[in-house]
């Protein structure tokens, strides 16, 4: 896959290493020894594990919701500062109302590694994702303003296989009712400075910051 996409466009060497901002306190993500050292003033994995193991004792049995699942993974301090507010802003729900599986794969590392992904290859297309999209669609017929669900038979006849990327409940004609969805609103702001926040990705994890 890496060779294929590089045959279309050139990639830079961007590596995703997010930072969390909790009321002006800065923490590395994913949760790793840099996070734990900043949170508790410690330096070894043994110290971090001891604190987390002590804090997770408040959870008895199998976690029943996202809050319990998060605490069972990273303890109460990190949950309160870096998980709870950010997650509730994302989902528009209290963490106690969200299922545990949402956060079961929360990465926790006992090394000083700020790399969010473990993938061998990482990068962003130079010139943006539009460049690679244009290359992928070269020679393809593109029709805009179409509604697949309005005439399924017509569009099904155009190809041996159809990949539908719309809402799954509408695809099945809402046979089980409408699903609840959360979406994103992107806002662009151009600032007259060389470097505004010091990192490509910063998560504002307190509940009061509206993003």
Model-derived regions: residue spans:
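A short alpha-helix-loop-beta-strand transition element characteristic
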Residues: 2-23, 78-81
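Residue-level signal for pocket-adjacent positions within structured domains
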Residues: 9, 15, 24, 93, ...
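Mid-domain catalytic core of redox enzymes
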Residues: 148-211
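Active-site/ligand-binding neighborhood in enzyme catalytic cores
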Residues: 20-161, 165-172
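Short secondary-structure boundary micro-motifs
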Residues: 2-4, 73-74, 126, 185-186, ...
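Short, solvent-exposed secondary-structure boundary motifs
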Residues: 8-11, 95-98, 125, 132, ...
């Amino acid at each position: 896959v890496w060779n294929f996409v590089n045959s279309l466009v050139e990639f830079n060497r961007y590596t995703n290493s997010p930072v969390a901002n909790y009321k002006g306190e800065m923490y590395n993500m994913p949760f790793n020894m840099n996070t734990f050292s900043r949170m508790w003033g410690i330096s070894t994995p043994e110290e971090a594990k001891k604190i987390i193991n002590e804090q997770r004792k408040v959870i008895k049995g199998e976690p029943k919701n996202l809050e319990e699942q998060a605490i069972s993974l990273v303890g109460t301090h990190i949950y309160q500062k870096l998980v709870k507010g950010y997650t509730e802003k994302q989902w528009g729900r209290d963490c106690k109302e969200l299922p545990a599986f949402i956060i079961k794969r929360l990465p926790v590392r006992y090394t000083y590694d700020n790399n969010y992904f473990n993938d061998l290859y990482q990068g962003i297309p130079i010139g943006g994702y539009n460049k690679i999209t244009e290359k992928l669609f070269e020679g393809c017929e593109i029709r805009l303003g179409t509604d697949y669900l309005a005439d399924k038979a017509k569009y099904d006849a155009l190809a041996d296989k159809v990949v539908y990327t719309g809402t799954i409940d509408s695809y099945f004609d809402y046979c089980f009712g409408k699903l609840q969805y959360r979406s994103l609103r992107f806002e662009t702001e151009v600032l007259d400075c060389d470097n505004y926040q010091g990192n490509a990705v910063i998560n504002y994890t307190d509940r009061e910051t509206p993003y």
